[in-house]
Amino acid sequence: MAGAKEIRSKIASVQNTQKITKAMEMVAASKMRKTQDRMAASRPYAETMRKVIGHLALGNLEYKHPYLEERDIKRVGYLVVSTDRGLCGGLNINLFKKLLTEMKEWNQKGVDIDLALIGSKAVSFFGSVGGNVVAQVTGMGDNPSLSELIGPVKVMLQAYDEGRLDRLYVVSNKFINTMSQEPQVIQLLPLPKADDAELKRKSWDYLYEPDPKALLDTLLRRYVESQVYQGVVENLASEQAARMVAMKAATDNGGNLIKELQLVYNKARQASITQELTEIVSGAAAV
């Protein structure tokens, strides 16, 4: 009956693991609702900022800000948003695959790449595969603030201001729904022009007070910060959704494994009982 005891021990072990994954699924579901609320609250601001900036890029401005001017591309920068924790399916690896594909294309063109990493998974990944990491931040938790992101953003903006970067992107996961999260690469600088057909049919002119330079310097930096923050918030919602789905799958798989082990255990127990009965009958016949 040693085999049956071993199987019974495995069943107990899987049941304990199943309890853990079920608890993690419930925690992730609760956190996902909170992050969705935060994402929904910040999204209108980020989208409005994007529209305003799109108007500016199309407009005939009396002051041409450096962030609006295209440059010859010699070096690009990526702000990479990942998670701090794992157990969220292929969320991070899908993001890294998309980024590596883009990096390979730039390398083939002879363009250098700088990376600013947000999240310990990105730090760990690019520590292994290599990359020119110029800034990083980890441990922001479930309630990230803009002040925690200022460091990497400031490093990349300073490099762009000094002409060491010619293009800047943010890479993160876009939350579509609970079952679907999509890696995305968004160009931050130079400012992309609005691609909405209705906006392109209109001409945009603005009056600036007190003066265009002071206003645009502040507005355009706020735009970059808002897009990075929105990327972090959406990535966090994607993380919790992916973790909830992954833990549910693990719980379901645990249930299936328990059923299989229970069947094996019953067969082993039946074989053991049959053997004992055979031995008893054989002993009685010998007497």
Curated annotation (Swiss-Prot):
It is found in: Cell inner membrane. Transmembrane segments: none annotated. GO terms for biological process: proton motive force-driven plasma membrane ATP synthesis. CDD domains: F1-ATPase_gamma (cd12151). SUPFAM superfamilies: ATP synthase (F1-ATPase), gamma subunit. Coiled coil: none annotated. One of its GO terms (cellular component) is proton-transporting ATP synthase complex. It is a peripheral membrane protein. InterPro entries: ATP_synth_F1_ATPase_gsu, ATP_synth_F1_gsu, ATP_synth_F1_gsu_CS. Disulfide bonds: none annotated. One of its GO terms (molecular function) is proton-transporting ATP synthase activity, rotational mechanism. HAMAP family: ATP_synth_gamma_bact. Produces ATP from ADP in the presence of a proton gradient across the membrane. The gamma chain is believed to be important in regulating ATPase activity and the flow of protons through the CF(0) complex. F-type ATPases have 2 components, CF(1) - the catalytic core - and CF(0) - the membrane proton channel. CF(1) has five subunits: alpha(3), beta(3), gamma(1), delta(1), epsilon(1). CF(0) has three main subunits: a, b and c. Belongs to the ATPase gamma chain family. This is ATP synthase gamma chain. The gene is atpG.
